[in-house]
Amino acid sequence: MFKYIGDIVKGTGTQLRSLVMVFGHGFRKRDTLQYPEEPVYLPPRYRGRIVLTRDPDGEERCVACNLCAVACPVGCISLQKAETEDGRWYPDFFRINFSRCIFCGLCEEACPTTAIQLTPDFEMAEFKRQDLVYEKEDLLISGPGKNPDYNFYRVAGMAIAGKPKGSAQNEAEPINVKSLLP
């Protein structure tokens, strides 16, 4: 009999403790954000959707070197190289499957031209998986992104069609490395 009364008192105490806890949570700051109405705080280095940027001249920065596709651990990037009349490389097609992408940022680190950049955009929900495959036209933005003054071909140099190397203005003659051998 005493055990029965003790169990009732213990159960009542548990219920009262739960009510006090629920009542106390009603006056505290909420832990949950009402997402669409309230903006979400993103850290400065947040890695979201991938974009392709342009150089200061307005051309595509991507030179189709394929380093991003090799660095991708899940293989969600595919591209094919093409060449313009002046010898500049560009991707004929550039495709990213965002249903496989883990947003690790290795493609951004591997890119020598800073063409691939990760943005803080994370709202990419789709009803069909095929809609998560982005083509080059979907990825290209109109601006230079994080590095506005960098132009890969200005830094790396590019041969001018019809002229031998070393004959351009302010350019030194190329060194024949085979003549340096003993």
Swiss-Prot record:
The record's remark on the cofactor is: Binds 2 [4Fe-4S] clusters per subunit.
Principal cellular location given in the protein's record: membrane
Localization recorded for this chain is: Cell inner membrane
Topology with regard to the membrane?
Peripheral membrane protein
Keyword Chloroplast included in the entry's annotation = no
The positions annotated for binding [4Fe-4S] cluster 2 are C72, C101, C104, C107
* E.C. number(s) listed in UniProt: 7.1.1.-
Would you name any one GO CC term?
Answer: plasma membrane
GO molecular function, a single term? 4 iron, 4 sulfur cluster binding
Q: Which PROSITE patterns match?
A: 4FE4S_FER_1, 4FE4S_FER_2
- Mind listing the UniProt keywords for this protein, alphabetically? 4Fe-4S, Cell inner membrane, Cell membrane, Iron, Iron-sulfur, Membrane, Metal-binding, NAD, Quinone, Repeat, Translocase, Ubiquinone
At the top level, the lineage of the source is Bacteria
Instruction: Specify the enzyme's EC class, one word.
Output: translocase
Q: Which reaction does it catalyse?
A: a quinone + NADH + 5 H(+)(in) = a quinol + NAD(+) + 4 H(+)(out)
Q: Where are the transmembrane segments?
A: none
State the Gene3D superfamilies in the record. 3.30.70.3270
One Pfam short name: Fer4_7
Needs which cofactor? Answer: [4Fe-4S] cluster
GO annotation, biological process: aerobic respiration
Q: What does this protein do?
A: NDH-1 shuttles electrons from NADH, via FMN and iron-sulfur (Fe-S) centers, to quinones in the respiratory chain. The immediate electron acceptor for the enzyme in this species is believed to be ubiquinone. Couples the redox reaction to proton translocation (for every two electrons transferred, four hydrogen ions are translocated across the cytoplasmic membrane), and thus conserves the redox energy in a proton gradient.
Q: Which family does it belong to?
A: Belongs to the complex I 23 kDa subunit family.
UniProt cross-references to PANTHER family, sorted A to Z = NADH DEHYDROGENASE [UBIQUINONE] IRON-SULFUR PROTEIN 8, MITOCHONDRIAL, NADH DEHYDROGENASE UBIQUINONE IRON-SULFUR PROTEIN 8, MITOCHONDRIAL
Q: What is this protein called?
A: NADH-quinone oxidoreductase subunit I
- Organism per entry: Pseudomonas fluorescens (strain ATCC BAA-477 / NRRL B-23932 / Pf-5)
